Amino acid sequence: MDVMNFLLNLVVPPAGLLMLAFAWPSLAFFRACEWALRIIYGEDMEGKVVIITGASSGIGEQIAYQYAKRRANLVLVARREHRLRSIREKARTLGAKNVLVIAADVVKEEDCKRFIDETINQYGHLDHLVNNAGLGHSFLFEEASDTSGFAHMMDINFWGSVYPTFFALPHLRRRNGRIIVNASVEGWLPMPRMSLYNAAKAAVVSFYETLRIEIGGAIDITIATPGWIESDMTRGRFMTEEGEVLFKEEPREMYVGPYPVAYTEECARTIVSGACKGQRYVRFPMWYNVFFLYRVFVPDLLDWTYRLLFLNHFITTASKDHTLHDFKGARKKLLITPTSLQLLHHQQHQSPKSSE
């Protein structure tokens, strides 16, 4: 080891801790003042322009409704245009001044440029960009039959946020706008059976934290890390080991396991409220924060917990028989599941065997 790094190893750790001890009280005070001001003076979204990707269902749909209640002008982006039309009508009844629907695929760079350009042509400016589109998977990395679907996971979960951001930056800069990105709790929590998804979301978190430093205060960035929320993913929409995107009950049960699933509307309300108050991070539900402490201080215990919950014999056996809700530790699963998912579960388990 060279002399310089040897000296830095001796000096930097104690000096850094000493500086933190002196700086923390002042930093905590300023943060408290900042929090109070944000509560009082939240951003008024009336008449402002908001683009929302992945707006055809789940969190994206509910985020659209939350902005509609704040009387914003909306641009709804997704591949399923027929779904966007019905969401547009509801958004109008909730208070949205104007709603533009654009069918586009965020994995295609030209589509991302197109919906940014169409937004500017329609409204003349852009205030908020909400990058929400995403796709999960539920298989162990070693279970993948080939690598054909790997790139698509990165395309939709990482590039699907980066492409719109690239084309929107000049317009957001002119309005001192804001980027809101759904990075998911898996961006920092290593959930088993989702290695590719976790990696993509971790890249999202790192990208936007770095971008925040690069652009300074010209554009604000809110990174949302929601946990299990009722959505297409918690209803069983995953990429399979073969690279196909399907709705399947079995992987949903293996993936979600005994975790409680929160309501989408409440999650969206928290994200939009946090963004309008200028929060750098929005975490929902808050109880997931305890896992961050585990990750930092006792990572071995976190690893053991996940193996117990997601990789043991009971889950593997139960998922094959569609009976995960009966395995030990998850017997009351339906009691902590939103109504929409309870109904889905009931329909799937009450269907006649001839249809299976």
From Swiss-Prot:
The chain crosses the membrane at residues 10-30. It is found in: Lipid droplet; Membrane. Its main location: other. It is a single-pass type II membrane protein. The keyword S-adenosyl-L-methionine does not apply. It holds the Pfam family adh_short. GO terms for cellular component: cytosol; lipid droplet; membrane. Keywords: Lipid droplet, Membrane, NADP, Oxidoreductase, Signal-anchor, Transmembrane, Transmembrane helix. It catalyses: an 11beta-hydroxysteroid + NADP(+) = an 11-oxosteroid + NADPH + H(+); corticosterone + NADP(+) = 11-dehydrocorticosterone + NADPH + H(+); 17beta-estradiol + NADP(+) = estrone + NADPH + H(+). NADP(+) binds at residues 54-85, 197-201. Its EC number is 1.1.1.146, 1.1.1.62. The proline-knob motif may be involved in the targeting to oil bodies. Has dehydrogenase activity against corticosterone (11 beta-hydroxysteroid) and estradiol (17 beta-hydroxysteroid) in the presence of NADP(+). May be involved in signal transduction regulated by various sterols. This is 11-beta-hydroxysteroid dehydrogenase. It comes from Pinus massoniana (Chinese red pine). The lineage of its organism: Eukaryota, Viridiplantae, Streptophyta, Embryophyta, Tracheophyta.
